[in-house]
């Protein structure tokens, strides 16, 4: 089985919180199952680019359609990882390489990770790496299942997408104009992403992913209640048939 894991961080390369630890362990664990072929896509942050411990080579380059823009992307293949996981860093100097601060917190984070979400799918096509399953994480990768269903279905006809919520408090909100200006999605998907007259990319992922997982069975049950779901309890209830909890580390 071919599995692609997409995340905004992953230890030891770049880590901000618990997601980084999960992405350090999950692909490696999946790769140890006989028959699995696992690839990991991460942004090529400046802190990765300047770390001489990581040996990389450019294996593809293309343009990513982001609204009316076409933004450059280079795929950098990590060549000195010790296990069977193949790591690819997606390089764009403006969005990732030229920034020396924290991974998150820039005013254009919505644009940065909309770019990354679409670039992941474009990279899979460029590398002729069409997976059976795409596993993507939190709001930063929430547009992957949306793009997969709305734009890339012909290129990924048999691929299924699993979306994992690690922290529902951060949902990827944007102004309504973000839909037209940045996303380049068909008009009929406006409602999929709309919430309170704004764009909510996590809502879009819940609606379009084939499977939605959380970090534990307890957390999955808690998300049925407004106190824990931060406004998404109704959306999750409507999609409860595809929601499940998988405890971290299992």
Regions found by a protein language model. Name each.
Residues 1-250:
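Catalytic cores of nucleotide-sugar-dependent glycosyltransferases that transfer UDP/GDP/TDP-activated
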């Amino acid at each position: 089985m071919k599995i692609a894991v997409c995340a905004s961080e992953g230890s030891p390369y770049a880590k901000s919180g618990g997601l980084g630890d999960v992405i350090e362990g999950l692909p490696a664990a999946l790769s140890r199952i006989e028959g699995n072929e696992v690839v990991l896509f991460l942004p090529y942050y400046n802190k990765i680019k300047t770390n001489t411990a990581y040996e990389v080579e450019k294996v593809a380059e293309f343009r990513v359609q982001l609204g009316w823009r076409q933004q450059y992307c280079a795929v950098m293949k990590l060549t000195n990882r010790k296990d069977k996981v193949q790591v690819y860093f997606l390089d764009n100097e403006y969005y990732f390489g030229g920034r020396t601060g924290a991974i998150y917190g820039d005013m254009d984070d919505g644009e940065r990770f909309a770019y990354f979400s679409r670039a992941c799918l474009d990279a899979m096509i460029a590398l002729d790496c069409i997976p059976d399953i795409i596993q993507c994480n939190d709001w930063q990768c929430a547009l992957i299942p949306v793009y997969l269903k709305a734009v890339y279905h012909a290129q990924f006809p048999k691929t299924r997408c699993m979306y994992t919520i690690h922290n529902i408090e951060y949902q990827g909100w944007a102004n309504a104009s973000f839909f037209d200006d940045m996303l380049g999605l068909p008009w009929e998907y406006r409602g999929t992403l709309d919430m309170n007259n704004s764009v909510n990319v996590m809502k879009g992922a819940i609606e379009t992913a084939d499977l939605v997982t959380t970090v534990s069975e307890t957390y999955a049950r808690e998300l049925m209640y407004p106190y824990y779901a931060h406004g998404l309890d109704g959306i999750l209830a409507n999609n409860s048939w595809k929601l499940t909890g998988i405890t971290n580390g299992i």
